[in-house]
Amino acid sequence: MLMAGQRGAWTMGDVVEKSLEGPLAPSTDEPSQKTGDLVEILNGEKVKFDDAGLSLILQNGLETLRMENALTDVILCVDIQEFSCHRVVLAAASNYFRAMFCNDLKEKYEKRIIIKGVDAETMHTLLDYTYTSKALITKQNVQRVLEAANLFQFLRMVDACASFLTEALNPENCVGILRLADTHSLDSLKKQVQSYIIQNFVQILNSEEFLDLPVDTLHHILKSDDLYVTEEAQVFETVMSWVRHKPSERLCLLPYVLENVRLPLLDPWYFVETVEADPLIRQCPEVFPLLQEARMYHLSGNEIISERTKPRMHEFQSEVFMIIGGCTKDERFVAEVTCLDPLRRSRLEVAKLPLTEHELESENKKWVEFACVTLKNEVYISGGKETQHDVWKYNSSINKWIQIEYLNIGRWRHKMVVLGGKVYVIGGFDGLQRINNVETYDPFHNCWSEAAPLLVHVSSFAATSHKKKLYVIGGGPNGKLATDKTQCYDPSTNKWSLKAAMPVEAKCINAVSFRDRIYVVGGAMRALYAYSPLEDSWCLVTQLSHERASCGIAPCNNRLYITGGRDEKNEVIATVLCWDPEAQKLTEECVLPRGVSHHGSVTIRKSYTHIRRIVPGAVSV
C-alpha cells in the first residue's frame, strides 16, 4: 500500500476525521432555533418559513433508518459483507449510483447488487460518509478510499483524500503519490506533488522510485526554472541515471529529457570530461546539437541566449533586494540601481534606470515618485512625474531595461502589485487629482486592461497582494489628509471591499506580504505594523526610533529590510534596518553610501555572472 509503513516526518496527524459539511449540531427533540429566526414576514399577511436545520434532521433520520434497516431497498454485496441502503440516498450522493439507478440498467431492478473493485472496509467508510458526511481517513486507508471514491464518483471525498496526501508529502512517498494522482487524473494533486518534487529535488534523487518516473513527468520537472539544485551537474547526472536504469528502453528518449538540462551552464571541464565522454551520449547522435550549443556558449561567453542559458532560480544566484532610484538630501534625482546582498554583506551594481544616460543632460529623464514590482524575477517600473505613461522591465539575466506597452492613464505616487501572474497599477495622482483607476498588464500579450476602480481615491499609499487578493492601505485622499482605510480587491469578482482600518492614518507608506501577514511601514508612524488577512486585524510589530516617510521595504532571505526614507526633520536616512521574525528583533543592517527616499525596493535573484561587484569599502556594515 502506498502510505502504510513508510518512513518520513508527517506534517499532520496520522489520522484525520473529515467532516465535509461543517460541524454537526447535536441531535435533540427541541427546536434548534427559535421559530422567529426561521420566518420572514411578507406584507404582514403571510410568512416565508425557511428551516435551515431541516437538512440536518433529514440526514440524521436517513442514518437512523439505515441503522434500523428500515425502508432500505437495495443491498450492496462487497466481498462477503452486505450493506443495506436506500437507492435514492446513493443516487443523490454519487454520480456512479445515479447513473446505475436512474438509467435502464439491470441493477435498477435488482435487490442485491454485487460491487467489485473495492473491499468491504472501504465501502463501509464511503457509506458512513454518504449518510453522515463524516469519514475517517488514515495513512493506512487513504489510497483505498481515494481509489474507491474516484470509482464511485464521490467527488468531495476525492478532494478530501487529495488534501490529506498533500499534507503528508515527504521525500519517500512523493513519487508514489504522484503516480496515484496520474493514474486517477487528479490534476490538482499532481501539480502540487510535482511542485513538491521540484522544491525538494536533491532529497528525492536517492529514492528508488524516482528512477521509475514516466518520461513526460521527468521532462516537466527538469524543465522548471524553480528546480532546487545547487549546480546543473546534478540535473545531468539525474538524467543519465534515469536512462541507465532501463537503457534498452530509454536511450531513444535521451534527447527528449536532455534538452531540459542546461548544458551551457555546466563547468567547461566537467562538460568535456564527463558529458562528452559519456558512452550513452556518444551512442546518441540526436543529442549532438545540444552539445554544439554548449560548446559555442563556452567559446563565445553569453552571446548565445536560449532556455538552456538561463540560470535556474537556485543556481549561481543570490537573493538580493534592489534600491531603485529615489531622491537625495538635496532633492537630487538618483539614476543608479543598487542590489544589496545581506548574506555576502556586499553591494552590487546593475544597469541604471532607463533614459538616464544620454550625453545631453537635458535629454535625461528623472524618475520621480514612480512605482515598481517584481514578476518572475523581472522588475517592472511605471509612471513618475516626468515619465507618467512609461513602463519598463529589467531583465536580470542580461542586465538591461526593456520598454513595454505604455499605461493608458499616466500617473505618479501610485503603486504596482503582482497578482495571478499579472501586474496591477493602482491609483495615484495625475497632476490634477487623486485617481481611483486600476490597470492590469498581461505580460504574454503586452497589453493593459482596466479593472474595477478603488473605493477611495488615494495616492502615496501602501499596496501588496496576499493569497489571491490585493490590498491597498492608507494613502492620501488629498494633499493634506491621510486615511486609515484598508481596501481589498478580489479578482474573481472584480470587486473591492473595505477591511479592518489601520491603527493610524498614514500616507507615504509601503507594504510587503511576508509569510501570513502584511507588514506596513513609513509615513509619520514611527512603527512597523502587521495586518492579518485571515483574522482581519492589525497589530504593532515594533517601534522605530524615527519616522521613515517614503522608505522602502522588501523581504530577503526570510527577513524584512527597511531602506532609507525621511525622518521628522525631513532629512534623508541612509541606514538599512533588518527585522528578524524568528528573533522578533529589529537591528541596523548597514549604512548606504548616501541617504535616499522615494525609491523603489524589490527582491530578485541575481546571477553573479551578470553583475560587477563594487569594492567592499563602498558599504559600511
Swiss-Prot record:
Cellular component terms per the entry's GO annotation: Cul3-RING ubiquitin ligase complex; cytoplasm
Residue stretches of each Kelch repeat: 320-367, 378-421, 422-468, 470-516, 517-558, 560-606
Keyword annotations of the record: Kelch repeat, Repeat
Residue span, BACK domain: 174-276
MF terms in GO: ubiquitin-like ligase-substrate adaptor activity
Pfam families (UniProt xref): BACK, BTB, Kelch_1, Kelch_KLHDC2_KLHL20_DRC7
Residue ranges of domain BTB in the record: 72-139
InterPro entries membership: BACK, BTB-kelch_protein, BTB/POZ_dom, BTB_POZ_KLHL6, Kelch-typ_b-propeller, Kelch_1, SKP1/BTB/POZ_sf
Transmembrane feature ranges: none
UniProt record, GO biological process: B cell receptor signaling pathway; germinal center formation; proteasome-mediated ubiquitin-dependent protein catabolic process; response to bacterium
Function in brief: Involved in B-lymphocyte antigen receptor signaling and germinal center formation.
The protein, known as: Kelch-like protein 6
Name of encoding gene: KLHL6
